C-alpha cells in the first residue's frame, strides 16, 4: 500500500469551507472564528465553495487542491486552507473527517510514502507526519538538491518592526490575562504574573526598538533596502541584543506552550467556543515566539557546521508602510543533516544522476 504526503496548505480546511459555503452570515460564536476573512466575496464564490463542500461531503473529492476540476484562485485558496497556527487540531469539530488528518492517518498505515524533500525535512524537524524514523527506509531521489532544500528549510526570518512588535506583545499579555481570568491553570507559571510578564515584555520591546535604530543606520532612510553583514559577523552591540532576545523569546515560547497544553486539556469541561478561540490565539502566539526564538539563536551563532551563518536585514514596503525584517541561514548544513537524517534514520539511500563525492562521480 502506498500514498503521497502533502503539506497542510495543499488541503482544504473543512471549518473554513463550511463558513465560505454558507449562505447565512458567519455565526462567529458557533464556529469560534477569529478575525479570519471567512465570508465569500460574492455569490459566485459562495456557489463554488458550496459545490466543493458537496463534493467533499459525498467523498467525490479528497480535499486536496490538485484533485478537483473546480478552478480555485490563490486568494480563495488562502481562505479555504489553513496553517499550523490556525488549526485547532484534535479540538476541532471537523477533526475526524478533516482531509489533512485523514491523509495523515493513511500515512501511518502505508508501506510506501511519496513526499518531496521539503516535506521530509519539515517532518523530521517537527517529528510529525512521517512514521517513526527508526522504522524508515528513506530513499532520496535527486539527492544533489538536498543541501539547497535543507538550507531553505532552515532559513529563519521574522518581522521586527518596532510598532508591530509592540502590538504583538500587548496582544500576548492580554491573552495571558484572559487565560488567567477565565481558564486559570492549577499551577501558575511565575512568568504569567502580570508584573513580571509586563517587565519581561518591556525589556524585549526596548531591545527590539534599539535593534531597529541600529539596523536602520545601515540602510538608506525611507525606502526599501537590504544590508548583509560581511561573513555573518554582527557588531558586538547587535550580537549582545540577539543573545538576550534569544533568551527572552524562548521564555515566552515556553509560557505560550504551557498555556496551550493547559487549555487543550480543558476542552471537556468549559465553554467550548471561548476555549477554542483562546486555543487558536495562543497557538498563533506560540508559532510567532517559536520562530523568533529560532531566529535569535541562529543569529547568536558565529558558525554553523564549521561555516559562517549568513545574516541580513531588509526593509520592505507593504500597503504604504515600511516593515523591517531580520534573516539568518547557515551556509553549510551538514550538522543539521546529520541531526535530522543521518543519525535519526537507520537506512537511507541517496540517488542522483549528478551526485558527486569529493568531486568525482565514481
Stretch-by-stretch model annotation:
Residues 2, 133-136, 344-346:
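Short glycine-/polar-rich loops that comprise or flank the Walker A/P-loop
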Residues 77-111, 121-130, 255-362:
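A contiguous, basic/glycine-rich beta-loop/short-helix subdomain that forms a polymer-engagement track
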Residues 1-111, 183-191, 321-322:
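A substrate-engagement module of RecA-like helicase motors
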Residues 84-112, 116-253, 353-362:
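Signature of the SF2 helicase/ATPase Hel1-core->accessory helical subdomain module
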Residues 36-46, 55-71, 90, 94, ...:
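Generic amphipathic alpha-helical segments used as scaffolds and interaction surfaces in large
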Amino acid at each position: 500500500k502506498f500514498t503521497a504526503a502533502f503539506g497542510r496548505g495543499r488541503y482544504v480546511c473543512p471549518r473554513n469551507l463550511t463558513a465560505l459555503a454558507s449562505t447565512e452570515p458567519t455565526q462567529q460564536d458557533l464556529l469560534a472564528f477569529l478575525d479570519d476573512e471567512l465570508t465569500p466575496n460574492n455569490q459566485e464564490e459562495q456557489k463554488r465553495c458550496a459545490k466543493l463542500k458537496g463534493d467533499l461531503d459525498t467523498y467525490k473529492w479528497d480535499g486536496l487542491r490538485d484533485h478537483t476540476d473546480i478552478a480555485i484562485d490563490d486568494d480563495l485558496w488562502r481562505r479555504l486552507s489553513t496553517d499550523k497556527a490556525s488549526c485547532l487540531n484534535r479540538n476541532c469539530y471537523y477533526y475526524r473527517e478533516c482531509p489533512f488528518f485523514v491523509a495523515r492517518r493513511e500515512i501511518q498505515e502505508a508501506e510506501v510514502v511519496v513526499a518531496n524533500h521539503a516535506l521530509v525535512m519539515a517532518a523530521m524537524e517537527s517529528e510529525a507526519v512521517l512514521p517513526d524514523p527508526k522504522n524508515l527506509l528513506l530513499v532520496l531521489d535527486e539527492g544533489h538538491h538536498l543541501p539547497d532544500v535543507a538550507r531553505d528549510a532552515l532559513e529563519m526570518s521574522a518581522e521586527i518592526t518596532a510598532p508591530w512588535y509592540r502590538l504583538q506583545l500587548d496582544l500576548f499579555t492580554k491573552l495571558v490575562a484572559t487565560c488567567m481570568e477565565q481558564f486559570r491553570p492549577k499551577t501558575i507559571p511565575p512568568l504569567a504574573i502580570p508584573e513580571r510578564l509586563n517587565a519581561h515584555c518591556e525589556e524585549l520591546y526596548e531591545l527590539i526598538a534599539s535593534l531597529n535604530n541600529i539596523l536602520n543606520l545601515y540602510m538608506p532612510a525611507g525606502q526599501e533596502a537590504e544590508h548583509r553583514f560581511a561573513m555573518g559577523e554582527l557588531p558586538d552591540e547587535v550580537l549582545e541584543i540577539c543573545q538576550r532576545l534569544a533568551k527572552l523569546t524562548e521564555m515566552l515560547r515556553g509560557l505560550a506552550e504551557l498555556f496551550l497544553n493547559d487549555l487543550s486539556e480543558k476542552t471537556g469541561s468549559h465553554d467550548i467556543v471561548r476555549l477554542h478561540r483562546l486555543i487558536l490565539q495562543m497557538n498563533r502566539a506560540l508559532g510567532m515566539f517559536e520562530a523568533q526564538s529560532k531566529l535569535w539563536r541562529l543569529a547568536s551563532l558565529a558558525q554553523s557546521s564549521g561555516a559562517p551563518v549568513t545574516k541580513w536585514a531588509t526593509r520592505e514596503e507593504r500597503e504604504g508602510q515600511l516593515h523591517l525584517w531580520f534573516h539568518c541561514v547557515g551556509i553549510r548544513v551538514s550538522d543539521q543533516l546529520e541531526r535530522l537524517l543521518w543519525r535519526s534514520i537507520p537506512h537511507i539511500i541517496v540517488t542522483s544522476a549528478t551526485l558527486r563525492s569529493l568531486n568525482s562521480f565514481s
